[in-house]
């Protein structure tokens, strides 16, 4: 597990970015603090008639650029510090993508595996009743995150509508909803689809003519890992030579079929022992001789211990925080092009934004329109960051922070919240 306090990391990253730009002390001080922190108590009647009391949070880090946006996590070890850190990262993620949002995040300390569906519904509705006064389609828009899903979003939206006595625009109160009640096409593949566009552009700046025949290894075979394997092989002609999950990985130099591997994983509980492939460890996967490496599982997998052994030319951070700051330096020295997490995996929040736009306007797009608009957004964001990195000769992560912080700072200046 992560040993550093998550919010301390946020402050360090912000201070580091400030070295590469002109920003006033007072603005920096402002950005180090969330604008609103809400802690709520949620009593829930359990199926056996007893009442359990849960603690929930909603953090709105900064709303200079628009309503705050961010997921709701249900986790037994949820902490306020983690929620604060993730809310700040949403501020940077929405800013780097140039979405008209600020950053928010929510969480409930709960082990959802111990709840029945009816108990989950009561908890979801209770949470919305508790935070009702600080959310709205124009103030703070939640979404699914760890251990929450479209069904939970549907209950939450329904509760919000019941209290507010409003219909259609209330669809926009929450994103990541089922398609039947205002969800967007393309949302389920959005994180991987967005990452694929950044990998395509990274290959161009490295002078590759095509991705066809190039190799990729993907750590993690959840939603993002599976869709990335499918998209990179089927749409870009790449060879997916290795994938893994928490139990281990598989390698086949001739390439793996994404759908067949998923079927195997669903039937056997892991990708391991997939026919025609060699079993490898997660550690071995990271050090394979491949063109692109995509960590799409957990944080801090590339560290100062193994960074020197990374052989990929592009590291696409589909997971949050998969590379430690020390490892960043080593990869940069090695000339590896890193696509930082809050750029690489921003396809999810971007399609959430598209969902909100469709809800507010009442006009829904085809899957082709969603993908085309996502492509434009991801491509522009990639070059916004890459050009700063080149111009200042700094790491892509530092450049992404500079782009994001500069945009938030400008909004704060224009509002008169801070001075130059």
From Swiss-Prot:
* InterPro entries, alphabetized: Aminoacid_DH-like_N_sf, GLPV_dehydrogenases, Glu/Leu/Phe/Val/Trp_DH, Glu/Leu/Phe/Val/Trp_DH_C, Glu/Leu/Phe/Val/Trp_DH_dimer, Glu/Leu/Phe/Val_DH_AS, Glu_DH, NAD(P)-bd_dom_sf
Cellular compartments annotated: Cytoplasm
Which GO BP terms sit in this record?
Answer: glutamate catabolic process
Cellular component aspect of the GO annotation? cytoplasm
Q: Which reaction does it catalyse?
A: L-glutamate + NAD(+) + H2O = 2-oxoglutarate + NH4(+) + NADH + H(+); L-glutamate + NADP(+) + H2O = 2-oxoglutarate + NH4(+) + NADPH + H(+)
Q: Keyword Lyase on this protein?
A: no
Keyword terms, alphabetized: Cytoplasm, NAD, NADP, Oxidoreductase
Positions that bind NAD(+): 220-226
What's the domain of life for this entry? Archaea
Enzyme Commission code: 1.4.1.3
Q: What is its main location?
A: cytoplasm
* Active-site residues, Swiss-Prot/TrEMBL: 105
Molecular function (Gene Ontology), one example: glutamate dehydrogenase (NADP+) activity
Q: What is this protein called?
A: Glutamate dehydrogenase
The organism is Pyrococcus furiosus (strain ATCC 43587 / DSM 3638 / JCM 8422 / Vc1)
């Amino acid at each position: 597990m992560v040993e550093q306090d998550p919010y301390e990391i946020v402050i360090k990253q912000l201070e580091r970015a400030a070295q590469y730009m002109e920003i006033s002390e007072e603005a920096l001080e402002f950005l180090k603090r969330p604008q609103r922190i809400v802690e709520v108590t949620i009593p829930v009647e359990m199926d056996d008639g007893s009442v359990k009391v849960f603690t929930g949070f909603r953090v709105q880090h900064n709303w200079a650029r628009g309503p705050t946006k961010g997921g709701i996590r249900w986790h037994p070890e949820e902490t306020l510090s983690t929620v604060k850190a993730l809310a700040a990262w949403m501020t940077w993620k929405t800013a780097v993508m140039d979405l008209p949002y600020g950053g928010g995040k929510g969480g409930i300390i709960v082990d959802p595996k111990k709840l029945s569906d009816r108990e989950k519904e009561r908890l979801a509705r209770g949470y919305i009743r508790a935070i009702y006064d600080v959310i709205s389609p124009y103030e703070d828009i939640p979404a699914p995150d760890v251990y929450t899903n479209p069904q939970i979003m549907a209950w939450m939206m329904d509760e919000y509508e019941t209290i507010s006595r409003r219909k259609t625009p209330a669809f926009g109160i929450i994103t990541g909803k089922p398609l039947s009640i205002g969800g967007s096409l393309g949302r389920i593949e959005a994180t991987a689809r967005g990452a694929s566009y950044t990998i395509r552009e990274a290959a161009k700046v490295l002078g590759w003519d095509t991705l066809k025949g190039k190799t990729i290894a993907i750590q993690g075979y959840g939603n993002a890992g599976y869709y990335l394997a499918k998209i990179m092989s089927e749409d870009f002609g790449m060879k997916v030579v290795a994938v893994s999950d928490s139990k281990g990985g598989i390698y086949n130099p001739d390439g793996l079929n994404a759908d067949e591997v998923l079927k195997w994983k669903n039937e056997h509980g892991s990708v391991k022992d997939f026919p025609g492939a060699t079993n490898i460890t997660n550690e071995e996967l990271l050090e394979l001789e491949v063109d692109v490496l995509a960590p799409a599982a957990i944080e801090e997998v590339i560290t100062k211990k193994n960074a020197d052994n990374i052989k990929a030319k592009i590291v696409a951070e589909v997971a949050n925080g998969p590379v430690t700051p020390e490892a960043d330096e080593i990869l940069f020295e090695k000339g590896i092009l890193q696509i930082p997490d809050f750029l690489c995996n921003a396809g999810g929040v971007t399609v959430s934004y598209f969902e909100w736009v469709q809800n507010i306007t009442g006009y829904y797009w085809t899957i082709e329109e969603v993908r085309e608009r996502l492509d434009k957004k991801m491509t522009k964001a990639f070059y916004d960051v890459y050009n700063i990195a080149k111009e200042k000769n700094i790491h892509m992560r530092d450049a992404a922070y500079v782009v994001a912080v500069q945009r938030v700072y400008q909004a704060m200046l224009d509002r008169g919240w801070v001075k130059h």
